[in-house]
Amino acid sequence: MQWLTRGLPILFAILAAWFAIRQNVLSNTRKPVPPGPHSTLMRLLAIGMLAIFGYQASWQLAGFRNAEFVAFMTRYSRRTANPREGLHRGRILDRNMLIMAESKPKEGRPRFYPFAPAACHIVGYVHPKYGTVGIERANEAHLTGRSGSDVKHLRRFGQNMLRHGMVLGNDTVLTLDARLQVEAARLLSGQRGAAVAIDPRTGAIRLLASAPYFNQNQIGSAMTDPASPMLNRALNGLYPPGSTFKIFLAAAAIQAGKTGGIDCPPEGYSPGPGLPPIRDHEYYENEREGRHWRGHGMIDLSTALIKSSNVYFARLGPLLGAQSMTDMLNRFELTKGQTLFTGSDGSLTAKASRLPTLTGAPTRVLTQTAIGQGEVLVTPFQMARAVAVIAADGRQFKPHIDAEVTPQLLSAPLSPQTAKTLRALMVKVVTQGTGRGMMASGVSAGGKTGTAQNPAGDDHSWFVCFAPAERPAIAIAVVVEHGGYGSRSAVPIAAALVQAADQYGLLDPLPASGSAK
C-alpha cells in the first residue's frame, strides 16, 4: 500500500507528460490518425489511475476529519508521530478566557494544561496510548477542526497535506472559573472529596472539583492508584448525604403546612420494635462526657433545622408520608442523570442519585431516608443543583458548562414562597446553628451541614450553601470523605470558596442581558 501511495504522483506525472507529448505530435500531423487499440487502452488506464489518485487524494486531504481514518493511521502508520500531532488542537478556555488547555508543539508539548491538575477531571486529557476523556473527548472534532462544512475541511486539510502546515482547531469556552478551580484544589489537597458551584440564576457551572487529582501527562500511574484519582467524584461519586438531605424534607413540610412542634426526647425515636433508636448528636456528645442530656423537647421545623435534629426529621418523615416525600424528591429529579455538556463527539453527564422506593416501604425506610441515611446515595453535583433551585426562588435552570449555551429554564420544583421560607431557615443555620463557621467568609449565606454515617470508616463531612443570602449568585456543595462532622471539614472549605468567588466577581449582579458566561 505504501508503494502505491508514493508511486501515484509519479505515475500521474508520467501520464500527464505522455498526453501532452502525444497531443503535440497529433497537432503537427497533417493526416488525422484514427484511434487504435493502444489509444483506447491508454485512455482506460489513465481513467483508472485518475480514479485511484482521486480516491487517495480525498483521504489525504480530508481523511483526518474521520475518526475511523485517524484510528487506522494511528495503528498502522509507520511514522513515529501520532496523526493527532499534525493537528494543532484548539484551546479550552474558562469564563474569563484564561487558557485551561492548549497545544505547544514547538516546545515539545502536544498538550499543555496551565492550571493542572486543578481541572483535570472535567478538562480531561489527550494521550497517545490512553486516548481522550473529558471535554477533550466530548468536543474532539471541534477542537481538532474536524467540525464544520466540507469545503472548510478540504481547505484546511489540503493546506496541511500539500504545504505540510499545522491544522488549526477551534477553541472551546467553558463557564468554569479557572481560579476557583485552583482554590478548590488547594482546599481539597491531601483529601478525598469534591466541590461543585453553580450560578442559580443561569445554571452556569462555575466549579467542578474532585480530589485526589492526577497528572494529565502521566496517566498510567493514576490508573493504578488505590485512591482512585481518575474518578470524577463531583459528577459520579455517590455518598450518603446525611443531614444535608433534610432540606428536601423541610421543603415538603413547608409546602404541606406541617412545620409545627414535634417532641424530641433524649432517648430518641425508634422506627419499630427491636430497631435501635435514632438519636440527636447532642446525646452522644453528652454521653462521652458522662453527662445526662435532657433532649430538645417540643421544637418546630425552624429549630430542628438549626440544630439538625435527627429525632425531629425521623418523626417528620412518617408524618409527611411516603407519597409526599416521593413527590418532593421527584420534583428535584435526583434520580435522573444530568447532561452538562454536549459536544461534537459526545456529552458529559452527571450520574443519577439512588433513592429507595418509599411507596409501601416500612417506617424504618421512611425515617432513614428522612435523615439522609439508609439506601440514599447522592452526588455532590445533584446536591449543588438542589440548593441552586432553593436559591433561585424555586426555579430550575438547565446546568451547563458550555459558555455558548443560552440559559434555559426547565421547571419550578418549588413555589417562590416555599423557596423563600426555606432560604430563611438555612440562613439561620449559618447565623445560629451548625453552619456558623460559614460566617468566616465575610459574605452572608444560608446552608445546611451534614455528617453522613459511613459503614466503611469515619463519617463523611458535608455542607451545602448559597450566597449572598439576599440575592444568591452561587450554590455550593462540598463533601470530604471521612471528614467527620460537616462543621469541622466541609464548612471551612465552603467558606473559603465563597470568599474566593466574591473576590473573582462571581457574586456580582448579572449584566442587563440577564446572562453571564
Q: Language-model segments: which ranges?
A:
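Periplasmic/cell-envelope proteins involved in peptidoglycan metabolism and beta-lactam response
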Residues: 1-222, 229, 233-238, 243, ...
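Beta-lactam-recognizing serine transpeptidase/beta-lactamase-like catalytic domain environment
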Residues: 7, 96, 159-160, 201-243, ...
